Amino acid sequence: DSGTYEELLPITIPAGVKLHGAGIRTTNVKPQAGLSADGVTPNNETTMFYVNNACTVTGFSFSGMTGFTPSGSEPENLELATIKGVFFAFDPNGAITTKSPYIKDCSCFSEGGVGAFMDRQVHNTGNKSMVFHAFTNLNSNGVGFWVRYGAKSEIVSCFTYYCHVGYSTTTGGKIRALNGNNSYGTYGVVSDGYDPNENTVNGNVEGEMIEYADDGVHQAYFANGETITGGTSNAT
């Protein structure tokens, strides 16, 4: 139904369950004041929704989460940031086994919140994936989507505004994004690191290569239109 719902967090959405709001302009979910369900963490700095296999969320706006703080030394690197105030994350007690959680036709609004955090380390089995369609993130100085440690996400028609980072993958996270945009924030799209558990595909590159040797240059610059030829390989 329409209305503003102030909730004790986190909320766990069971596998196969659909949450259907009356519309993003009429149904809003936000954290109630005080502490979260653990009795320690501020309610607006915990996770709003833990999602599970084949669950769906549609037709809501979300607001009020906060707590994200970027690293002072590497502000673009979310691995070094303080992550709080997440709207969507994997349920630590679940697994994505047949269908990804699907968040569509929703918006979130926050000062320092994180729209979605997908961390493969949370799950030992399953697909470790989420799917988003038309999930708009207005998280001032926060984060839109962060995919970590080989987790996977498809992000379609999702726009971020004023985020410190719009889309981020680290340590082998994977994003397939279509028809999206990151506007007015600090960093649009950031990728860093690799999956330490990934099996590499090794190969050789065939061909010649020119190596630049500083001590062998006789002119201060190359002339426009000049052809450069390797002294040994004769590659041009």
Predicted regions and their residues:
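Extracellular beta-strand-rich solenoid/capping regions of secreted or surface-exposed proteins
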Residues: T4-H20, N28-G59, S63-I96
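Short, T/G/N/S-enriched strand-turn elements that build extracellular solenoid repeat scaffolds
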Residues: Y5-P14, K18-L19, T47-V51, F87-I96, ...
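All-beta strand scaffolds that present successive hydrophobic residues in beta-strands
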Residues: K18-G21, T56-G59, I96-D105, N124-A134, ...
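A generic "binding-loop/recognition-motif" signal
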Residues: R25, G112, A151, C163, ...
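Surface-exposed loop/edge segments in extracytoplasmic proteins
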Residues: R25-K30, N234-T236
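Autoprocessing Asn-cyclization modules and mimics
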Residues: F49, S71, P75, E79-L80, ...
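Right-handed parallel beta-helix
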Residues: T56-G150
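Contiguous, function-dense segments enriched for cysteine-driven chemistry
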Residues: G185
